[in-house]
Design a protein with these regions (language model features):
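Hydrophobic/aromatic residues within well-ordered alpha-helical segments
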Residues: 27, 70, 77, 81, ...
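Hydrophobic alpha-helical connector segments
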Residues: 90-121, 159, 167-174, 203-206
Length: 238
């Protein structure tokens, strides 16, 4: 059974190994969720594993069993949100419909801001400090991800399915527009005079961002219309 876990295979349901795996995954999830909130509220320097254990309602020894150091736990929080953000763009493929691909990506990024606001804030704080823990990840995985998606967008442009855009800067805009609903939610709550943002706020924000992006990129929707060639004249009218 240990060999199965090491290979990433799930043991048969109901076995001792399966129950052990479920407990491990549950404990790790609780620790990571607690760590997201503590790191977001206190920063890396202000956080302690004792605070995280208390938030997770687990013994401190359990935290150190799964994550040997506070830094390792902090890196795990950052890696988890970064991997989720990159995975949300899996639909941006050459054979995909541009309107659907961007709609799904923006919706997924906004949902991440709604469901994991603390993780987003941890990342934002990391970036404000020049990304000491994720600089290599940004220069490697994120760089390659952006270059891969840029090639897809360039192909869509060449096929006349959207207007020419600077793809990396398009993603910078999308990241800022969606992540602000997590990173600066207190600003929005104050302006809207609400204790917390409602699901409708995220939906309204996503809908607006989608309309703006599709419009600016000259992507038509419905009945394959987005595949029609975007002419220079249409670009000037936009």
């Amino acid at each position: 059974m240990k060999g199965q876990e090491a290979r990433g295979e799930e043991p048969p349901s109901g076995t001792v190994a399966a129950r052990r795996l479920r407990r491990r995954l549950d404990s790790e999830a609780r620790i990571l969720a607690a760590a997201e909130q503590i790191f977001a509220e206190t920063g890396f320097s202000g956080a302690t594993t004792a605070m995280i254990a208390a938030k997770a309602r687990l013994p401190k020894a359990n935290v150190h069993y799964y994550f040997r150091t506070k830094r390792q736990l902090y890196q795990a929080v950052l890696q988890r949100i970064l991997e989720a953000w990159l995975a949300s763009g899996d639909g941006i493929r050459a054979e995909a419909d541009p309107a659907t691909a961007f709609t799904d990506y923006i919706s997924a990024k906004m949902e991440a801001s709604r469901r994991q606001p603390y993780a987003s804030k941890v990342f934002a704080n990391e970036i404000l400090h020049c990304a000491p823990e994720v600089d290599d990840y940004l220069r490697d995985q994120v760089h390659r991800w952006v270059q891969d998606k840029a090639r897809v967008i360039d192909r869509w442009v060449a096929e006349g399915r959207m207007r020419p855009v600077d793809a990396p800067h398009l993603f910078f805009v999308l990241w800022a527009a969606t992540q602000t609903y997590a990173d600066f939610d207190c600003q929005m709550r104050a302006v809207l005079r609400r204790r917390r943002l409602a699901p409708g706020d995220y939906a309204a924000g996503a809908a607006l961002i989608i309309r703006m992006v599709l419009g600016a990129c000259g992507i038509r929707t419905g009945n394959g219309a987005d595949r029609r060639r975007v002419t220079q004249g249409a670009e000037r009218r936009g």
